[in-house]
From Swiss-Prot:
Pfam families: C2CH-3rd_BIRD-IDD, C2CH-4th_BIRD-IDD, C2H2-2nd_BIRD-IDD, zf-met
Entry keyword annotation includes Transcription: yes
ZnF CCHC-type: positions: 196-219
Binding residues annotated for Zn(2+) 2, in chain numbering: 198, 200, 213, 217
Annotated protein name in UniProt: Protein indeterminate-domain 7
Residues that hold Zn(2+) 1 according to the record: 171, 174, 187, 191
Regions of compositional bias (Low complexity) in chain numbering: 248-265, 288-299
Motif (Nuclear localization signal): 156-163
Chain intervals annotated as zinc finger (C2H2-type): 92-114, 134-164, 169-192
Residue numbers spanned by region Disordered: 1-52, 235-351
GO cellular component: nucleus
Residue positions, PTM Phosphoserine: 82
A GO biological process held by the record: regulation of DNA-templated transcription
Length: 455
């Protein structure tokens, strides 16, 4: 019996082992097939998912706009409260202490302290609670329409105070006003703790003021950059063409100045009678037969372009004109020198004196402390001083502003023998006549003395 049981048990174990082996092989095959199928499915799903991601990339990249306030439930009850109701702070008053409350439930809770009967509203399960939305009472407000109504009573109150109410709360530090007390308290906590510094050095405690100031500074910097010339462009402009153009401008300026002194027709809206009256008084020795007494190509004013240094800048700086005292000293030196023959001495004397007087008159008319102040400005001031209502209208150099300010003795000496700093046109001409007569008389006397010595 025992041997039969052992044999049966041994056979059962062998059968069980064979079944396990067969199950393992079948399971491995099924698993392999399942894994291969899963691989193909996962690869296919990955491809589809990648394709779907590529399709949805443009949609995710778009920025979502923020919803504007006031998007109520279409089924909500629209409440339109009056401005008086919205601005009321104490709608519910306590009968004992006359303390006001905004809500009835706050009043009921307050009554407990007075040992008064109080009652809170109880909601029953049968009552259907309908949501309420509130519109702004102002007709021109965007929240006046029911589609833009606000869903909170506190929110509509604050909106009405901020946009349409009076700003009662003022910050003591920055003087900014608020209509809502909570906004004022929130601002007071951070006011003065943070500073906004501009590049120009100005400090601001408020961000909005800083932004406004910064925009103004940026605009001013752009305008200044446009107005200031570029140094590289200035250096590049030092070309022969530029100097030729500048020389032509200077020649035109000198020729126009000579035409004003020598001709009776002025370049400007002046009357013909006034121009003839002024130039009839010019002495003949000033407008001599020799149009070029000082050798400057027929111009009373020497060309500015001749003294331009091409290595520095394209804008020539005019050399300071000689003062009247220096010219008189030069005249004394020229008068002290003697020529070899009387004829040459007489010619050189007359030429020197004519050159001196012409240069002196030019210096009196063109020796202000500031460059660019010439005969046209002197004549314009003199013309306005004598009642003439018309002035030059850009006859000399177009684009330049006329300087009507007279220097109070800060520059070099302009007058002769202690006269005032600016003489009228008639006084200059009379002085020139007297000076010319004196010079001619002295030259004649000197010539007579030389003839007497030779005899």
């Amino acid at each position: 019996m025992m041997m039969n049981r052992d044999i049966l048990f041994h056979q059962q174990q062998q059968q069980q082992m064979e079944e396990n082996m067969s199950n393992l092989t079948s399971a491995s095959g099924d698993q392999a097939s399942v894994s291969s199928g899963n691989r193909t499915e996962t690869s296919g799903s990955n491809i589809n998912q990648h394709h779907q991601e590529q399709c949805f990339v443009p949609q995710s990249s778009l920025k979502r706009k923020r919803n504007q306030p006031g998007n109520p439930d279409p089924e909500a009850e629209v409440m339109a409260l009056s401005p008086k109701t919205l601005m009321a702070t104490n709608r519910f008053i306590c009968e004992v202490c006359n303390k006001g409350f905004q809500r009835d439930q706050n009043l009921q809770l307050h009554k407990r302290g007075h040992n008064l009967p109080w009652k809170l509203k109880q909601r029953s399960n049968k009552d259907v609670v309908r949501k309420k939305v509130y519109v702004c009472p102002e007709p021109g407000c965007v929240h006046h329409h029911p589609s833009r109504a606000l869903g909170d009573l506190t929110g509509i109150k604050k909106h009405f105070f901020r946009k349409h109410g009076e700003k009662k709360w003022k910050c003591e530090k920055c003087s900014k006003k608020y209509a809502v007390q909570s906004d004022w308290k929130a601002h007071a906590k951070t006011c003065g703790t943070k500073e906004y510094k501009c590049d120009c050095g100005t400090l601001f405690s408020r961000r909005d003021s800083f932004i406004t100031h910064r925009a103004f500074c940026d605009a001013l910097a752009e305008e200044s950059a446009r107005a200031m010339p570029n140094p590289i462009m200035i250096q590049a402009s030092n070309s022969p063409h530029h100097h030729h153009h500048q020389t032509q401008q200077n020649i035109g300026f000198s020729s126009s100045s000579q035409n004003i002194i020598s001709n009776s027709n002025l370049h400007g809206p002046m009357k013909q009678e006034e121009s003839q009256h002024h130039y009839q008084n010019i002495p003949p020795w000033l407008i001599s037969s020799n149009p070029n007494p000082n050798g400057n190509n027929g111009n009373l004013f020497p060309p500015v372009a001749s003294s331009v240094n091409t290595g520095r800048s394209s804008f020539p700086h005019p050399s300071p004109a000689m003062s009247a005292t220096a010219l008189l000293q030069k005249a004394a030196q020229m008068g002290s020198t003697k020529s070899t023959t009387p004829e040459e001495e007489e010619r050189s004397s007359r030429s020197s004196y004519n050159n001196l007087i012409t240069t002196t008159m030019a210096a009196m008319m063109t020796s202000p402390p500031e460059p660019g102040f010439g005969f046209q400005d002197y004549y314009m001031m003199n013309h306005q001083h004598h009642g003439g209502g018309e002035a030059f209208n850009g006859g000399f150099v177009p684009g330049e502003e006329k300087n009507d300010v007279v220097d109070d003795g800060g520059g070099e000496t302009r007058d002769f023998l202690g006269l005032r700093s600016l003489m009228s046109h008639n006084e200059i001409l009379s002085f020139a006549n007297n000076l010319g007569n004196c010079l001619n008389t002295s030259a004649t006397e000197q010539q007579q003395q030389q003839h007497s010595h030779q005899d």
